[in-house]
A protein has these predicted regions:
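A generic structural signal for short beta-strands and their flanking turns/coil linkers
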Residues: 64-66, 82-84, 107-112, 147-149
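ATP/nucleoside-binding phosphotransfer catalytic cores, i.e., glycine-rich phosphate-binding loops
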Residues: 72-75, 80, 105, 115-195
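Catalytic core of DAGKc-family lipid kinases
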Residues: 1-85
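Generic preference for hydrophobic
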Residues: 70, 88, 113-115
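Gly/Ser/Thr-rich active-site loops/lids in small-molecule metabolic enzymes
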Residues: 43-51, 102-123
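Glycine-rich phosphate/pyrophosphate-binding beta-alpha loops
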Residues: 28, 32, 87-103, 170
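A residue-level signal for conserved active-site and pocket-lining positions in enzyme catalytic cores
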Residues: 16, 35, 86, 113, ...
């Protein structure tokens, strides 16, 4: 224990802010981002991670037809898109994918935004999945990937209520949202690195 205390250092890390709430890892909205809330506790207890996959398979056809047309505004990107999903990440790892946001860092002062536009599932999705496992998905034509300090996301008239998840919590007020980075907001205790 004494050695552990001796060998620690602190590192300042950024935190994301959405309206009046905060997140460390990720904010997401769109397809399948609400699965964790739909899986009954008894299924989670019996099936573990498999319960999430089964719920995703069940929900996928329903959510595929959901209209999600959103307007994104930042210095780096502005546009109105028909989307399947969008992520705002503060770290590389999202939802079990180690490099979902390959340029992200918890201490760079930026949020990484990935907008996955609606696409033809039979022709475009397989290529996107292949690129995802290679870490090349930001280059896919159905993806907008950029880094920003601030982002506003607005619903359009056609868009129904979309669940917004931030680090496992549901943002009750939904859209519109203002998202920003709070640089060096937390001090983390980590093992000392030798340089």
């Amino acid at each position: 224990f004494c050695q552990m205390i001796k060998d620690f250092q602190t590192k300042k890390v950024d935190v994301g802010r959405v309206n009046n709430e905060y997140f460390i890892n990720v904010l997401a909205a769109g397809m399948l981002t609400d699965i964790a809330y739909k899986v009954p506790k008894d299924k989670k207890a019996v099936l573990g991670k498999m319960a999430y996959y089964l719920e995703g398979v069940k929900e996928f056809p329903k959510q595929l037809s959901q209209n999600m047309t959103l307007t994104f505004n930042s210095k780096e990107y502005s546009g109105t898109e028909d989307i399947m999903l969008f992520l705002v990440a503060n770290s590389k790892s999202v939802g079990g994918f180690a490099d979902a946001a390959p340029l992200a860092s918890v201490s760079d002062g930026y949020l990484d935004v990935m907008i996955i536009k609606k696409m033809a599932l039979l022709t475009e999705a397989p290529d996107l999945i292949f690129k995802l496992f290679q870490g090349e998905h930001p280059k896919h034509p159905s993806i907008e990937y950029f880094q920003t300090k601030e982002l506003s996301v607005l619903p359009t008239e056609q868009t129904a209520g979309i669940a917004i998840d931030y680090d496992g919590e549901i943002l009750e007020e939904g859209l519109p949202v203002d998202i920003s980075i709070v640089p060096e907001a937390l001090n983390l205790i980590i093992l000392r690195t030798t340089n």
